Amino acid sequence: MIASKSSLLVTKSRIPSLCFPLIKRSYVSKTPTHSNTAANLMVETPAANANGNSVMAPPNSINFLQTLPKKELFQLGFIGIATLNSFFLNTIIKLFPYIPIPVIKFFVSSLYCGGENFKEVIECGKRLQKRGISNMMLSLTIENSEGTKSLSSTPVDQIVKETISSVHNILLPNIIGQLESKPINDIAPGYIALKPSALVDNPHEVLYNFSNPAYKAQRDQLIENCSKITKEIFELNQSLLKKYPERKAPFMVSTIDAEKYDLQENGVYELQRILFQKFNPTSSKLISCVGTWQLYLRDSGDHILHELKLAQENGYKLGLKLVRGAYIHSEKNRNQIIFGDKTGTDENYDRIITQVVNDLIINGEDSYFGHLVVASHNYQSQMLVTNLLKSTQDNSYAKSNIVLGQLLGMADNVTYDLITNHGAKNIIKYVPWGPPLETKDYLLRRLQENGDAVRSDNGWPLIKAIAKSIPKRVGL
């Protein structure tokens, strides 16, 4: 729910302390008639734990499981056993580096990874379209944020070329094929995820010392590599817009992935800012670059406000992918920088996405929040955004530029429910792909960093859901 355009008020009690600057740092919309901005929005979020109210339960998995082929059900059964309890999960994590790649490919990879090559990823995209998921966020899974492994086997130049090639050979045909057969603004953009730690040698030192003159050459190389890829996206957006001028959202988007806090603070935020200035000018109808903010960080609300102010002052738009966070188990000073409990993170996430969504609804193409990806497996957060978009009629720009995203193979019950029961069309899946050894590392990181999410999605509840879905599949 949003307040009416004629009279918007701030309800202080509904805004966490870190968001109070919203009241102080008001800004004026580019359109004089729009008196409503992120500074004076009434923020209304779903019932929160802190208020003692119920939290929306995720949909059961049975209906989705009934749509899967037998092979995928078998693979999911294996995942259910592997995540049955903490002992099983921790044992799998310890053994994972020693499990042969062919075994991982058979049991796990096809569920969570798009494939090893363009052909396999294209087929993955077609399967997703059949499920009502119009597009993907592709991620070539090669990274080295700790600077501990050599990239000599996959030189950075090759990663850049392969990434650009995936734009032209996967994302472009994936969306072109739909532009001629579906309503043009019902198709989500295609995204290419750029991991800064994969796009420069010695990434940890370069990102940590991003503003250090001694690292200028390496810094410039990282900026150039990201710019090469994003420029391809920008030029394709401009070209396609001439052919499809009624399109309200970008056709494709370059997305800067998050790194750990020290690298994010010292380098990645500045890298995002540079790319926003180059490829998201207010003079362009479409944005071409999105950055990532991890909202489990205590300072995330203030940081987004700071970035918003810089965007207003310098004539460009932000692109936001908002996640809860992926490094909770490996951050060195997590007790100081991350909310102390899940409730704090959930409240922060829902309030910030509410503010951004409301701003996009009210200000439309004049919003400095040019594009939003709600990257979450949390059903309450996804339904919050879905209901906000349903609450007003005149919000075609917001509907096109607010996209819901989940990881491939995860939260499929949520994805299925949003599409089937709520008519959501603005949905994508994050699709990692690439060399088997690298995707193996990705899968291990998912187990380590998302262990709690994996257990809640899988384990014994998944095994029971699979068992219940089998009789219905055979008509019993």
UniProtKB/Swiss-Prot annotation:
Tell me which UniProt keywords the record has, alphabetically: FAD, Flavoprotein, Mitochondrion, Oxidoreductase, Proline metabolism, Transit peptide
Catalytic activity, per the record? Answer: L-proline + a quinone = (S)-1-pyrroline-5-carboxylate + a quinol + H(+)
Q: Which GO terms describe its molecular function?
A: FAD binding; proline dehydrogenase activity
Q: In which pathway does it act?
A: Amino-acid degradation; L-proline degradation into L-glutamate; L-glutamate from L-proline: step 1/2
Q: Give me the Gene Ontology terms describing cellular component.
A: mitochondrial matrix; mitochondrion
Primary localization class, coarse: mitochondrion
- Please give a single GO biological process term from the UniProt record: proline catabolic process to glutamate
What domain of life does the native source organism fall in? Eukaryota
Needed cofactors, names only, are: FAD
Top enzyme class, one word, equals: oxidoreductase
**Location of the protein in the cell:** Mitochondrion matrix
Give EC number(s), comma-separated: 1.5.5.2
**Annotated family:** Belongs to the proline oxidase family.
Q: What does this protein do?
A: Converts proline to delta-1-pyrroline-5-carboxylate.
State the remark under miscellaneous. The expression of proline oxidase is controlled by proline and oxygen. Proline oxidase requires a functional electron transport chain aerobiosis for its activity.
**What is the protein name for this chain?**
Proline dehydrogenase, mitochondrial
What is the organism of origin for this protein? Saccharomyces cerevisiae (strain ATCC 204508 / S288c)
